[in-house]
Amino acid sequence: MANNTRARRQARLSRSLGIALTPKAAKYMERRPYGPGEHGRARKKQDSDYAVRLREKQRLRAQYGIREAQMTRAFEEARRTKGLTGENLIELLEMRLDALVLRAGFARTIAQARQLVVHRHILVDGIRVDRPSFRVGEGQLVHVHSRSETMVPLQVAAAGAHRDVLPAVPAYLDVKLEALQARLVRRPKRSEIPVTCEEQLVVEFYAR
């Protein structure tokens, strides 16, 4: 029951933001390609600049499944980092442990990836890490604990069952899926990161 409720909530949020946050939400949006609610089919009036920027920020937050406080901290770090703030922001978010667990194909959704981390199934360089926000460094190995490899969901992942719903493995990850191992070979580049976002709108939202 809880899973069904969560799935419906994600589908509703996906329709509201105009982006599929889970494979189930993608199928739901194919059937109902309009916003939620009784007025979802109606033509909407043009959004204000603030509303456009807010929605883009919410879209980015939802794709990484993070809280507003986490987003704000990441933005402040991105702003202090040399380079374009918007690109820096997404690159920093992509180096979160839960994001890389998802990209590697160990999980089907960002929520599942976070659960794997929180429940201590994931190691970084041989050390258990239970913080989804952990920043993985270049060259570090993300892998599943040997005692967890026999779990059915992880056996399913190792067999490549999620590849039909996930983007191709990006070039910044070296993945050995059958071994449930993934190495971050270098810092991700914004152009390679499979998230849908006009990051300049996010920058403008926080800079207002």
UniProtKB/Swiss-Prot annotation:
Q: Does the keyword Signal apply?
A: no
Entry-linked InterPro entries: Ribosomal_uS4, Ribosomal_uS4_bac-type, Ribosomal_uS4_CS, Ribosomal_uS4_N, S4_RNA-bd, S4_RNA-bd_sf
Q: Where is the S4 RNA-binding domain?
A: 95-161
Question: Which GO terms are recorded in the biological process aspect for this UniProt protein?
Answer: ribosomal small subunit biogenesis; translation
Q: Entry's SMART domains? A: Ribosomal_S4, S4
Q: Which domain of life is it from?
A: Bacteria
UniProtKB keywords: Ribonucleoprotein, Ribosomal protein, RNA-binding, rRNA-binding
Q: Which PROSITE patterns match?
A: RIBOSOMAL_S4 (PS00632), S4 (PS50889)
A Gene Ontology cellular component where this protein is annotated is: small ribosomal subunit
Q: A single Gene Ontology molecular function, please?
A: structural constituent of ribosome
What's the stated role of this polypeptide?
One of the primary rRNA binding proteins, it binds directly to 16S rRNA where it nucleates assembly of the body of the 30S subunit. With S5 and S12 plays an important role in translational accuracy.
Q: Quaternary form?
A: Part of the 30S ribosomal subunit. Contacts protein S5. The interaction surface between S4 and S5 is involved in control of translational fidelity.
Q: Which family does it belong to?
A: Belongs to the universal ribosomal protein uS4 family.
Q: HAMAP family annotated for this entry?
A: Ribosomal_uS4_B (MF_01306_B)
The name of this protein is Small ribosomal subunit protein uS4
Q: Which organism is it from?
A: Pseudarthrobacter chlorophenolicus (strain ATCC 700700 / DSM 12829 / CIP 107037 / JCM 12360 / KCTC 9906 / NCIMB 13794 / A6) (Arthrobacter chlorophenolicus)
| Gene from which the chain derives | rpsD
